[in-house]
């Protein structure tokens, strides 16, 4: 094996310098320069692009790239200055057309030149970090043509003038506009923005500022909104046709500011045509347009919502505090429902079912519904009217819709316990008189109340229905155990559980003998089948059906109250009775007796008795006889039927007092629950917590809460802190 060292072979560089003929570069450039002239002069068809490419290639290869690049700039600049002169000389409409044609020519020339100088573009330009040929061509066009002192301002003014003409209804060459504005975009984003878009937006702002002032002085609100809507569509169309897509948001913002935002207050409050006028006259289309336009600008919808709320509250306040409109409870509630329906339609059809508008509607209704302290009573009376007669022949879905509307008003009530009080009274009268049109509707409403307020709210109402069912079963048992009673008067007894039904003072009266005997038999039966029970007859709540024969044998069935029955039965044994005699025989209290006689002797069509002397009032000196001339086209005649009417002022005060008494234990229970959980709490937090817990039933009065706290302290449920008297402690 050889131990010789390995040798490294080296190849030395060629030492003899290759010398290129100095005239070569000049000759080659002349060829290329001539070709560029020919291209700009539209004589490129006779050129050999392969040969030209090879010449440019060799110049770069032999280090004459700089000469080639500099020559290109000089030659292109020469031609562009010539082009500029020709464009400057163009008159009128020919100006833009020539500019566009020369721009297209320049682009075609630039493409050919770039193809010829492709090798220079890839090597020399990249190495020396110079501007590439295509971009160079754009810059030279910009600097020598677009920025020419005689073209720049003229070009901008021409374009803006064409836009103005189009805005005022003239037809313009949109294709030409698109091509020229596309030129700005091709020259670079900054060129488009600084040299066209910015002045375009400024001119647009001025145009719409002037136009909006003209419109607002000559149009009503609805007409103005139509005119404001139109340019928003037109400007988007303008962008699509000949502007940069990025300009859409900017020009839209200009129109929104000048046509809408700057006039929001004036438009909304415009006399005889602003938002209030639209609300009053159900102008859904105008309101919908206002909503869609105002949502585009800051605080636009807030303004619309605030004006609607203010109007709604003023209208509602007038509605519920007008004494004339409070005379009929059913009409009072129906007006509330009509207004609610109206604004539901407005919000749905015009305001895009906007939740913030819905919330404003709800808060407004809650505000004015509670301004009238009788709203809970009136809503209950409305239900009473519907469930007595108003829902006859109404489909199940429509019934449910009406009940849902009632529940909507119920939710607005701050004193739901007051509603409960009245509802219980009215339900009791319906059940006892058998005057409800639908048991299903009655139960359906109770289910809705239960869902809304919980079991505690409806437990007594459900107890009333239970009593009605139990009473029916009890009566069947009573008559089954006394078959001998099938002949004679029929007794129908409702056994009411104390606590479930509204408490009423027990008013005793002397029942007719045949009825009294039946009552005693029922008492014996009931107490014999139930242990630990006590029965107390509520004759003032009863009704009776009695058959009567008048002069000439005319027969009728009279539906009367128990008191009226007691009076009428006396005339089976007497032809003529004085007020005093009736009073002694029946022992009906004076106010009730007078009302009873008045309904039978002084009401046309119900006057089964005749009073002597004739007058509208009942006096203790009056005498009464059966009215032999009584006639009615109906066999069954209702006399003095019990209908729910709004309470008198004293009755209202009495109900209010009962409600206040019922609230006391509820407030105390809430305080105890809170303190048991928190152990120690200050006065203000107790007030806040109690109010929050009870708000589903009523709005607790802070003064009453304070009284209940004092009462609980006295009974050792709570104590004050020794160091901080505003703190309370729970005593286990």
From Swiss-Prot:
Cross-link annotation Glycyl lysine isopeptide (Lys-Gly) (interchain with G-Cter in NEDD8), location: 676
Phenotypic consequence of gene deletion: No visible phenotype. Cul3a and cul3b double mutant is embryonic lethal.
Annotated ranges, domain Cullin neddylation: 662-724
SMART domains: CULLIN (SM00182), Cullin_Nedd8 (SM00884)
TM spans (from-to): none
Keyword Ubl conjugation: yes
Annotated InterPro entries: Cullin, Cullin_homology, Cullin_homology_sf, Cullin_N, Cullin_neddylation_domain, Cullin_repeat-like_dom_sf, WH-like_DNA-bd_sf, WH_DNA-bd_sf
Subunit structure: Interacts with BTB/POZ-MATH proteins BPM1 and BPM3.
PANTHER family listed in its UniProt record: CULLIN
Family statement: Belongs to the cullin family.
Protein name: Cullin-3B
Native source species: Arabidopsis thaliana (Mouse-ear cress)
Lineage: Eukaryota, Viridiplantae, Streptophyta, Embryophyta, Tracheophyta
